[in-house]
């Protein structure tokens, strides 16, 4: 071809021929590139790699790369290799929406795995609905939501917050009578604490025995706040702290607990957003006995978990890298998505959304998780105590798996709502009015 172009170029009036030849070359190249692009299935990874949430989210990007690599070693999916497209929304909530749009519209990803905070999830929801794409969300959250385009593989409040309070109220958990609800100032802690406050009052806890406090993202000056907790806990009744603090603010919070000598035997703290990753950089000796509620702990001994940890260490080339609950949620969600795609032999969003409810995938703790019609999954619940090495000893667990409930039974505007995308095709069906479109609290 190139010899022909050179020959034509020496002739008079050859500009048209050159243009045509160049156009043909561009068309051929474009066709090759398009065919090349179609040879892969693109998967979007939407996690903060910088900013206040990087401490928690970077690991989720890494585990997705591992899962994609593993699937490619098995031969890919539908005869194609999987290709990760990684972006950094930088703990900037509006930027999450921009990056989600970029992944779906520009990069043409088939699915997105991402977000940690509820404010980031809320930011991207309109984009996924408008562009009809799929988001797998791997972190515990406040509930009060069920969207057609989202699959929630983290815990709903009935799979984490409520069981944690029940444990702390029990004799084994210390029979707590006073409660500090301490959280970061955004939608997840505020809604979760609204549910917990209603639940505690149903259990007979009085207003004066509930203290609620919020601090900004990235908060670091915990001396005054921890002093308030200490004072509240010195009133003669057993006091417990329920922590919905998110991101790197957890590090100075736990350091200050140690500085002020608050031991788990005095005022136990149960955390919903602190796991092995967040404790990795801390001196955990002063924190021994404090608690976390999750659906997975690295210390749980099963063949599946041992294999997962070994694979993780090999992939990261670092035996000190920990595993945690949201990583397991991505493991479950990714395998569910793969099964759904194989079932419908397509990555078409509508087909995959229809196929996902009913899909089962193994978890890492010895059981199976199932995607429910409300786009939440079944999960076991564990309460773990912090050990001196930054791991957790399981001190309590449910007998089996707990189905995720999208709408709280303890809030007036929510208790009559159901989410069912299989039969009702609705995420907020009101059982009283028999209509879709109910509003939660």
PLM regions and their residue ranges:
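Extracellular/periplasmic Venus flytrap/periplasmic-binding protein
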Residues: 98, 142, 149-260, 299-307, ...
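Periplasmic-binding protein-like
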Residues: 103-115, 136-138, 178-183, 235-247, ...
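Extracytoplasmic "Venus flytrap"
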Residues: 44-63, 87-94, 116-119, 184-190, ...
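Extracellular/periplasmic periplasmic-binding protein-like sensory domains
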Residues: 256-331, 341-347, 397-433, 437
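Solvent-exposed, acidic/polar segments of extracytosolic/periplasmic ligand-binding ectodomains
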Residues: 41, 360-441
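Signal peptide-proximal N-terminal region
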Residues: 38, 62-84, 174, 202-207
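Beta-alpha junction/loop-to-helix N-cap segments that form part of ligand/metal-binding clefts
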Residues: 55-62, 75-145, 153, 214-223
